[in-house]
């Protein structure tokens, strides 16, 4: 066995396990907690049962409050029963406590509530046990005593029978309510949260091992099977060349998916500023919430794409949201693997995250990815519209039901998850762009001839419900005049991958870039400007409230575009933003 190739051993083991599982048809998973859950999938049960920093969970704290309410409410009813007879409070206390008899006094009902309170608080709040046995004993003892009390109490000698009956029934119901709440709410929700949290904080081997032993039917769509890393290979081997080819193909697939999302028409406006910059959002099944920022930048499209893609290691110099940014593997001139560390956000609630991304960039012409020869020809000849364009593949819309995308033969196929788009009819080209910039009807192509407003107005306003009524009534200073954009779009994309050379750091939480990308659209007659569209969908891992995550992501996007404009101004001053020459 020691002389066998590790890849052969692994393949044999996977085949044996898959065949064994296929014979066990009765095996069904209720849910797969090992999959990379999005922040959007965190349930209320998890939030209620989660014990942050070792503190008491919300659901257990409510149980302790319920037990306290039991004692206080029973005591209040007892006071009403003894005072309503007309006796002085001290005389009533003397009869009920000092001269106590089980036949005439109701103080024993309060005593049972006190004992129940002390026992439950001691075991479930102080000792923090997670078993139903104690609550079962306390409830059983309380109910047995109350039932016995009904038979031995002297009801004929009582003056306020109604209140005394209410006192006993209330104590009985509260005791059973505590037992039900602990057994059906506290214990299940805390166990669910612990299981969920262990899954999210498991080591790197967990998501690499478990998906490998699941057959296709047991594996949920977009599971971590798409994101576990490859086995190490010897340097300068033939397998490295094959791996580079797979990374290249994976980058092209991710480019197409990012372009599909950018071109989709089901975006909802979230924020709009006075320069016309907009932030949209949309919801995708199995992915979560995706954001898109649209802005106009006074810089050539290709030059801006090259600066952001090829000079990524310089990004921390002008983007304060990044602590570190570097290329860890160069695959080819338009594909690489990068490592980035972001600063915290959300008022300190979102800590620093690090990301390992597979990036790719290409030129799209009429919705198709162009090869190197076509890219060079299109870049050198703007006016030739009769080119015989042999592009690598067209971008097709993927419906919600298209979930059986074949995986690459290697485990690096992390971007093979399907990004479903809306099933509605396809919008006219650039209609989304026009709507985001407030134009009434841009038709198949749009124009922008005016200069952008001053760069000191980055205040965003909530769009939400009123955006539909205001989209067609935006004033002239906020909407550039109509013009044409070229059919050429420079697109970059990024998706998270597992890369053995960059293991998770204990200093940061490893985030997941589900999908992100930029589209740089050229403008006819304005070669020194372009339209930038940025889509972003992240899984930051860990527990982050939804409203905090939304605020942090939208704020980071607006800060990024503001810093990008400042960076572009510096580039123009240095002479690096000259418009490309045309023939």
Curated annotation (Swiss-Prot):
Residues 85-104, 154-161 are extracellular. GO terms for molecular function: cholesterol binding. It is a multi-pass membrane protein. Gene3D superfamilies: 3.30.530.20. InterPro entries: MENTAL (IPR019498), StAR-like (IPR000799), STARD3 (IPR051869), START-like_dom_sf (IPR023393), START_lipid-bd_dom (IPR002913). It is found in: Membrane. May bind to and transport cholesterol and may play a role in ecdysteroid biosynthesis. This is Steroidogenic acute regulatory protein-like. It comes from Drosophila melanogaster. The gene is Start1.
């Amino acid at each position: 066995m020691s002389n066998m190739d590790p890849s052969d051993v692994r393949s044999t083991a996977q085949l044996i396990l898959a065949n064994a599982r296929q014979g066990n048809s009765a095996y069904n998973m209720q849910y797969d907690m090992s999959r990379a859950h999005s922040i959007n999938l965190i349930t209320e049960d998890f939030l209620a049962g989660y014990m942050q920093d070792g503190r008491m969970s919300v659901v257990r704290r409510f149980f302790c409050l319920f037990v306290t309410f039991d004692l206080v409410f029973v005591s209040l009813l007892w006071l009403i029963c003894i005072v309503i007879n007309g006796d002085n409070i001290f005389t009533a206390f003397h009869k009920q406590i000092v001269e106590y008899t089980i036949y005439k006094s109701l103080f024993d009902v309060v005593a049972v509530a006190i004992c129940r309170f002390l026992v439950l608080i001691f075991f479930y709040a102080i000792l923090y046990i997670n078993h139903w046995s104690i609550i079962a004993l306390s409830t059983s003892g309380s109910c047995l005593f109350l039932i016995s009390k009904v038979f031995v109490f002297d009801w004929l000698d009582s003056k306020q029978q109604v209140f005394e009956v209410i006192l006993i029934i209330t104590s009985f119901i509260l005791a059973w309510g505590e037992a039900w709440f602990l057994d059906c709410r506290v214990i299940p929700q805390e166990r669910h949260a612990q299981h969920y949290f262990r899954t999210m904080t498991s080591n790197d081997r967990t998501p690499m091992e478990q998906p490998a032993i699941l057959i296709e039917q047991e594996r949920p769509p977009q599971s971590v099977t798409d994101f576990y890393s490859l086995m190490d290979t010897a340097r300068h081997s033939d397998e490295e060349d094959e791996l580079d080819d797979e990374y290249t193909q994976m980058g092209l697939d991710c480019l197409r998916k990012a372009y599909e999302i950018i071109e989709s028409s089901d975006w909802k406006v979230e924020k709009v500023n006075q320069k016309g910059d907009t932030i949209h959002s949309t919801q995708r099944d199995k992915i979560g919430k995706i954001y898109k920022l649209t802005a106009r930048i006074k810089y050539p499209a290709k030059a801006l794409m090259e600066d952001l893609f090829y000079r990524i290691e310089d990004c921390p110099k002008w983007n304060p949201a990044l602590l570190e940014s570097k290329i860890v593997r160069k695959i080819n001139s338009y594909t690489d693997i990068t490592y980035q560390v972001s600063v915290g956000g959300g008022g300190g609630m979102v800590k620093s995250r690090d990301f390992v991304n597979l990036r790719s960039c290409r030129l799209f012409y009429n919705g198709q990815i162009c090869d190197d020869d076509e890219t060079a020809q299109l870049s050198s000849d703007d006016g030739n519209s009769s080119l015989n364009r042999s592009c690598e593949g067209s971008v097709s819309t993927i419906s919600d039901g298209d979930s059986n995308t074949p995986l690459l033969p290697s485990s690096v196929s992390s971007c093979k998850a399907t990004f479903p788009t809306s099933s509605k009819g396809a919008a006219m080209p650039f209609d989304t762009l026009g709507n985001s910039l407030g134009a009434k009807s841009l038709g198949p192509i749009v124009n922008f001839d005016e200069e952008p407003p001053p760069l000191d107005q980055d205040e965003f306003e909530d769009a939400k419900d009123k955006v539909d009524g205001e989209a067609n009534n935006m004033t002239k200073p906020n909407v550039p005049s109509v013009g044409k954009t070229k059919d050429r779009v420079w697109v970059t994309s990024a998706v998270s991958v597992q890369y053995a050379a960059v293991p998770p750091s204990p200093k940061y939480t490893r985030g997941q870039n589900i999908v992100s990308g930029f589209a740089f659209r050229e403008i006819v007659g304005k070669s020194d400007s372009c339209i930038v569209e940025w889509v972003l969908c992240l899984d930051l891992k860990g527990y982050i409230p939804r409203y905090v995550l939304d605020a942090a992501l939208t704020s980071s996007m607006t800060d990024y575009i503001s810093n990008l404009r400042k960076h572009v101004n510096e580039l123009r001053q240095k002479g690096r933003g000259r418009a490309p020459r045309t023939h």
